[in-house]
């Protein structure tokens, strides 16, 4: 539906997901690409883990004495930027083409940076989001070693963010893409505007390679930056779609971050995490922080 079989064979699943999700987003937005200036139409689609499954497959050939049989497509299939690259190729998008790789924040950072590109006049329209296909032996083994995966034996207790009995996450796969455009561009084409991006904050804990800062200071500062840019107050926020990985440390430290950023208003805002329903999509998961609340508006 979104790509021919030959093109699909040259893509890791995360790239296939990105191309399909972008097609759905463009269709949902009612955009006619033939009427667009494609040099002003960009791509910012991130990926966190790359094509580890491809690396596994081709490395096995090397270890079995068949290095000369390694696929010529191994490198372009495994590198993270090919989610954005394949989307640009599939739809002829000739504006900015960037790949954000910031682990679980990838999707949100991609949308935020695309917002900035439009804000400063570098693009009129951007497709932005994240894509991931992490389910393979190496990735699963690594997360098991980190004790990050759920040990629950009952499915409805396997991914339970902020629950006192939480014990890790469940790996998911997929992609999510949104169309961002300047207000002027949207109005000129008579677009049905679903939501407006009015604030974006991005910070770093500079603390540890896997653990968030225990006091939540960095995450709190990111939320405060977004709130301030939007020109609102914490009391104006109705809902937070949290990272909520269902791990002990993340959910505890994220709760501290929300309380630090929102003060007493933290007790009045609705909070949940979509990982209880779709699992952890890593580089793709944080697009849900924008898209699912938008759908509910």
Task: Enumerate the language-model features and the residues they cover.
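Conserved beta-ketoacyl condensing-enzyme motif
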Residues: 1-102, 131-140, 234-252
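Condensing-enzyme catalytic core mediating Claisen C-C bond formation in acyl metabolism
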Residues: 154-230, 238-239
């Amino acid at each position: 539906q979104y790509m021919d079989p030959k093109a699909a064979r040259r893509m890791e699943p995360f790239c296939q997901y990105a191309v399909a999700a972008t097609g759905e987003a463009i269709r949902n937005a009612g955009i006619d690409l033939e009427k667009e200036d494609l040099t002003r139409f960009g791509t910012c689609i991130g990926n966190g883990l790359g094509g580890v499954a491809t690396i596994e497959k081709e490395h096995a050939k090397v270890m079995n004495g068949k290095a000369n049989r390694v696929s010529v497509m191994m490198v372009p299939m495994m590198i993270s930027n090919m989610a954005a690259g394949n989307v640009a190729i599939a739809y002829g998008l000739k504006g900015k083409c960037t790949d954000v790789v910031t682990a679980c924040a990838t999707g949100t950072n991609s949308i935020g940076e695309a917002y900035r590109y439009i804000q400063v006049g570098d693009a009129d329209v951007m497709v932005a989001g994240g894509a991931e296909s992490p389910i393979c032996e190496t990735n699963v083994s690594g997360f098991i070693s980190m004790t990050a995966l759920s040990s629950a034996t009952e499915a409805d207790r396997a991914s339970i963010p902020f629950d006192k009995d939480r014990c890790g996450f469940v790996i998911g796969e997929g992609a999510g893409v949104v169309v961002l455009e300047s207000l002027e561009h949207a109005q000129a084409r008579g677009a049905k505007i679903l939501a407006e991006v009015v604030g974006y904050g991005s910070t770093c804990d500079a603390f540890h390679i896997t653990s968030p800062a225990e006091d939540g200071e960095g995450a709190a500062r990111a939320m405060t930056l977004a709130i301030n840019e939007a020109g609102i107050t914490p009391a104006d926020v109705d809902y937070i779609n949290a990272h909520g990985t269902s791990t002990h440390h993340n959910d505890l430290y994220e709760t501290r971050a929300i309380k630090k950023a929102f003060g007493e208003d933290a007790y009045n805002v609705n909070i949940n995490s979509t990982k209880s329903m779709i699992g952890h999509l890593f580089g793709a998961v944080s697009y849900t922080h924008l898209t699912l609340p938008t759908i509910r508006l």
